[in-house]
Amino acid sequence: FIISPLGLVGPFERIFNSIQSGVPTHSQAVISDFMDEGYFATHIRRMRSIYAERYHALRDLSERYLPEFLDIQPTQSGLHTVGFLKQDTDEIALSLALDKKGVSALPLSRYCLKKIDNKGFTLGFGAVNPDQIKSSIIIMADTFNELI
């Protein structure tokens, strides 16, 4: 809802109605059948398995290639985890260096309004397969060895 002066209620309603389009009835029916027939639950189970495999690849490869640099945090769900830096170093400089090499590891400070003591990165694993995770971890290890 929106609070507006009485004289603007009409114009706001017209603008809202012109940009607000609901989901077409046909699409709603297809999605309803998809869910009623159990395909949605099957899809969720399949994706959970895929994401768990990718998380474990990230964790295991980090333990193998980055043990002196990152402490990967456990996660039971989601598509990202946190890797805390074990050394006091410039997470932003590391993130920028990784970005130049095609690896996205966003610094935790990006998500904080106040300065925090823990430095590290958010690491996504949902959109990359285990082979891509391995090549990214190797790039991270090489970059960390160069800069730390």
PLM segments and residue spans:
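Conserved PLP-binding active-site segment of the aspartate aminotransferase-like
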Residues: V82-Q87, A105-T143
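Surface-exposed helix-capping loop/turn segments at secondary-structure junctions
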Residues: T42, S62-I72, I148
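Conserved glycine-rich beta-strand-loop-beta hairpin in the small C-terminal domain of fold type I
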Residues: S49-R59, L70-F84, L94
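Conserved core segment of the aminotransferase class I/II
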Residues: F1-S49
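Feature representing long, continuous alpha-helical segments
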Residues: G10, Q28-A29, D33, H56, ...
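A common structural junction motif
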Residues: Q20, D99-L106, D142-I148
